[in-house]
């Protein structure tokens, strides 16, 4: 009975994607206009992140966000059964050579960072098909057991191993002799007991957890950033960018700052594609951080 959600997802996954997109239109309308799912949070996040925009821009971006959020939801479910050739066609890649080893050569390890932008579920699958080394996806278990089981099966479909946030250090030490790719979305709000780095992100003093930098120090792996762009409905492109080839040459704070800069640059390219329902700024910075925070960056203009 606890896994009812799992079988509901299985049934939806069996639908053709064209039918699922029709359901997505209904889902977008329900979440934005009927149930108003976190509409206040979305509005606040957009206004605080882009304070110089017009009312028309806020309304248009919010509406586009809910449409794409619904699309990504049904796409993630469809990904459970999507064949590899279709995945590689729907999410093309460039610049991933640092994680791809020619035949006969040792796999190349790395730490792969990204954000909740565009279709991050397909990105996990695509990364596991692209990288030569085994991919370990770091994740937080979902509260619903059925949804969690479905997500684990989907994300691990092409060989990825799913590791919880709490168990990642133990997993890294256990497999330290095997080159691996550690993949994680590092833009979530950290817990109060985690090591935190405060910085400016989207015009706000924001907390980032230091986990990626700690992993880089422990493993000595190069660190990369995966930037996805939405080309059209169900079509994406993932570009691999280098954050640090040798972690020893960069401080942990510098590494996080470079990640944050790439994250913000990516969001500004397609702001409607970020996960604005997330209560990203729920942690308040200490007063000392507020007093020493740099001035707000100049607003980068983007088309509404």
Name these PLM-found stretches.
Residues 52, 63, 104-105, 129-130, ...:
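Non-catalytic C-terminal accessory region of glycerolipid acyltransferases
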Residues 89-93, 117, 144, 162-165, ...:
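A conditional alpha-helix N-cap/helix-loop micro-motif detector
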Residues 22, 56-57, 138, 165, ...:
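Residue-level detector of family-conserved "landmark" positions at structurally sensitive sites
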Residues 12-15, 118-124, 174-187:
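Short, composition-biased local secondary-structure segments
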Residues 7, 41, 122, 150, ...:
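Short Gly/charged-rich anion-binding patches and loops
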């Amino acid at each position: 009975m606890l896994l009812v959600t799992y079988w509901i997802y299985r049934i939806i996954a069996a639908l053709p994607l064209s039918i699922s997109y029709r359901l997505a239109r209904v889902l977008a309308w329900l979440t934005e206009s009927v149930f108003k799912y976190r509409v206040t949070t979305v509005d606040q996040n957009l206004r605080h992140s882009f304070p110089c925009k017009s009312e028309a821009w806020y309304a248009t971006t919010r509406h586009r966000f809910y449409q794409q959020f619904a699309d990504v939801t049904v796409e993630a479910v469809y990904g459970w059964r999507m064949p590899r050739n279709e995945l590689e066609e729907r999410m093309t890649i460039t610049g991933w050579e640092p994680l791809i080893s020619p035949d006969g050569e040792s796999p190349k390890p790395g730490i792969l960072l990204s954000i909740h932008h565009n279709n991050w579920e397909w990105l996990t699958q695509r990364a596991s098909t692209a990288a030569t080394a085994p991919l370990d996806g770091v994740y937080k278990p979902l509260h619903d057991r059925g949804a969690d089981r479905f997500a684990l099966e989907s994300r691990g479909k092409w060989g990825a191993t799913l590791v919880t946030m709490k168990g990642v250090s133990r997993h890294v030490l256990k497999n330290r002799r095997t080159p691996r790719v550690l993949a994680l979305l590092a833009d979530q709000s950290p817990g109060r007991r985690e090591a935190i780095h405060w910085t400016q992100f989207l015009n706000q003093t924001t907390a980032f957890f230091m986990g990626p930098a700690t992993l880089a120090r422990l493993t000595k792996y190069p660190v990369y950033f995966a930037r996805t762009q939405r080309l059209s409905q169900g079509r994406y492109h993932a570009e691999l960018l280098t954050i640090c080839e040798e972690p020893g040459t960069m401080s942990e704070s510098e590494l996080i700052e470079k990640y944050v800069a790439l994250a913000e640059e990516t969001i500004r390219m397609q702001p409607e594609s970020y996960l604005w329902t997330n209560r990203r700024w729920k942690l308040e910075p200490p007063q000392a951080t507020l007093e020493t925070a740099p001035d707000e960056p100049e607003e980068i203009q983007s088309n509404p």
